[in-house]
Amino acid sequence: MSAPVLTRPRCLRSWSVLWSIMVASATIAGGAGRGNSAQDSPNILWFVVEDMSAHFSCYGEKAVETPHVDRLAREGTRFTRAYTTAPVCSPSRSAMITGCYQTRIGAQHHRSGRGSAPIHLPREIVPVPVLFQKAGYYTCNGSGIAETGASNLKRQGLGKTDYNFQWDESAYDASDWSGRTPGQPFFAQVQIHGGKMRGEKTVQRAGLAKQANEETGCATDRSSVSLPPYYPADDEILDDWTAYLDAVRLTDAHVGRVLARLENEQLLENTFIIFMTDHGISHARGKQFLYDEGTHIPLIVRGPNVPRGAVRADLVEHIDMAASSLAAADIKIPSWMQGRDFFASDGVPREAVFAARDRCDETVDRIRSVRTDQWLFIRNEHPARPMLQPNAYKDGKSILQRLRSLHASGSLSPLQEKILFAPQRSKEELYDLKTDPFQLENVASDPKNAEVVQEMRQRLSAWMASCGDDQPESPSQYASDMEVYLQSQKGERREVIENNIQLNTKWRAEGF
């Protein structure tokens, strides 16, 4: 399998000129190269992008061109079937940084453990940066863009973490690798805002388009946008998706600046790079849910001993990047780590990948999924509740408000009504990914699929048992986290959250 042949948008400027500018900028910002390419251990660098699906041109997206991410794919290995184990930031990042399923470490509820009921990792589990520190690595978490002055060496400048368990900031030496000892290898996380760059208002979207045009030579043409069939071709929905694709362009530009810096510091060829996102696009059926829109992510690896120009279609999970990075640095993978080295010579491909969605902010849910080569099976523990049950975060978005308005006016198609606004959900969902890539038709109740359903039930139950995933969140944990959450909210939004908390508490008492 080979990557698709791509053509450049007409408005794109010469990338050779822009690349030269980036390289020159990196030289000014980063200073002279250190000449560390001969060091014994490779550097490890993770690009971690927020709220973004695989809408990059190397993955077939035709409305944008992403030359820097495409370069990583061309010079490395691109995975076409990589999935996050959690479709929301904090559980995903908690899993990523430990190489363990979030349900294994008790970190599955979004922004949990912040209050009077802190979450502690099991005694044997150690965050990945600590493992690298113990091996002599300099660890950092920031933007990947060299800064002037000493501020980039301070821990208070760290990039996003969002871990749901107790951890010590000393796991990171700084926000940038420029403070390390000459020749010392580094482990760096480069945080990119990704889909969070798109705003809610027309003026914000216009500003993003202007920025995309200035930084990449092109802004997205709305007429080129292709929506999934369960979203209406409505102006608000199209404008939002257009802004999202401009965020994809700017994400790519950020990657380009970091690559330019690595080249100027003569570090690129000895750096093991992973590009990924924490979960899919923030949309009605994306972020927070276990369909492809929420769990399918881009995953590209470039570096020493990584096959160049390779495209792999085997199933991988985002927790595999932890084990793969340790292996690349010749650090022993701990026996407790559930992620796998996807380049291991004796590696066995995964037969299935798993995911879990639990409480998101004030909104309680419990959904589990297992995916094989052909099938996606989803189990809903609260099927009597609608998919889009009240949630202040989602309901505050203009796209959700517009979808609810179209629903109220009867303007959605029957398919869109069924997918987005069914009053209840099925206890079990089964989708044939070969014939139904958008997961539109639940075939779990079809008698001819009875054996498949039984097999998927067994797979899912075995995985849950292996993680000790057998209980919902306790009322005390919920109360503790909601107390902290409300402290950060004001005005009308706080009132909405308080009402949602009351509703969720009532539903729990009723066994709903």
What are these regions (language model features)?
Residues D40-L45, E75-T80, A135-T139, G183-F187, ...:
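Loop/turn elements at helix/coil->beta-strand transitions in domains of secreted/extracellular proteins
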